[in-house]
């Protein structure tokens, strides 16, 4: 039972209009569906940068795609045109430099509020990783490299498509994927210490985990605010996913050929 605020008539609780004066009656409850939608909206927000102008969805995704193309183009240039010069460098120094610059780049790309500074961090990862890959690719057959590239592209396309069609698959995967990746790294490190080698199963596990990370990172990118800073950061994360898959596929394919 409720009272019409216009004429004071008594109405049933489900009435949407007053039978005496015809005034529309306010609905007092939004119900569980409204509460669930509010909770879902709050849960789906993963902001990495909370200031700056927001871009359209199309411009935002094109920016991420353009940054990824730029990163892989830099890698390709270093691998195809500077392999001879890079192969003359000390491999241990190259690896250490890659790790140091990569870590600095990741930190810079995540803590700065300037898109330009984040782009510098992006390059601090892209260029050393290109140099590192150029030194590695000289030990593989050209066909193996091509197969690994095609495989990486197909995996990335499939996972992004899955993230678009079934985003709920990737919503809560972040902690699970992180724990899985750390566990695999620990196992691989132990194998190298005690047996002096890794395993194809480890490489397959990393490929599967990083493939899931592509879907997860793409979903996060489109749930965060569509700013230029976030576009750079998520492009870096997707770039890392792709490079890891490519390197592991190279190892798997080279073992199968041998």
Residue ranges and their predicted role:
Residues 2-12, 16-258:
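A hydrophobic alpha-helical transmembrane-helix feature that marks the membrane cores
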């Amino acid at each position: 039972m409720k009272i019409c605020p216009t004429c004071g008539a008594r109405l049933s609780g489900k009435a949407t209009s007053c039978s005496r004066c015809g005034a529309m009656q306010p609905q007092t409850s939004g119900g569980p569906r409204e509460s669930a939608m509010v909770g879902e909206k709050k849960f789906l927000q993963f902001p990495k940068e909370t200031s700056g102008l927001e871009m359209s969805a199309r411009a935002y995704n094109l920016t991420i795609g353009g940054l990824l193309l730029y990163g892989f183009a830099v890698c390709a240039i270093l691998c195809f045109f500077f392999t001879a010069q890079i192969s003359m460098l000390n491999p241990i120094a190259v690896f250490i430099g890659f790790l140091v610059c990569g870590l600095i780049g990741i930190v810079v790309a995540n803590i700065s509020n300037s898109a330009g500074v984040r782009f510098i961090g992006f390059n601090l990862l892209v260029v050393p990783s290109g140099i590192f890959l150029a030194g590695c690719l000289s030990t593989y057959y050209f066909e193996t490299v091509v197969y690994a590239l095609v495989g990486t592209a197909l995996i990335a396309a499939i996972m992004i498509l899955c993230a678009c069609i079934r985003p709920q698959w990737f919503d809560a995967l972040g902690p699970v994927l992180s724990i899985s990746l750390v566990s695999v790294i620990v196992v691989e490190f132990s194998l190298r210490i005690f047996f002096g080698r890794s395993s194809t199963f480890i490489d397959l596990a990393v490929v599967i985990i990083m493939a899931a990370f592509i879907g997860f990172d793409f979903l996060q990118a489109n749930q965060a605010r569509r700013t230029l800073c976030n576009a750079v950061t998520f492009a870096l994360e997707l770039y890392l996913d792709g490079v890891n898959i490519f390197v592991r596929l190279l190892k798997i394919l080279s073992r199968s050929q041998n």
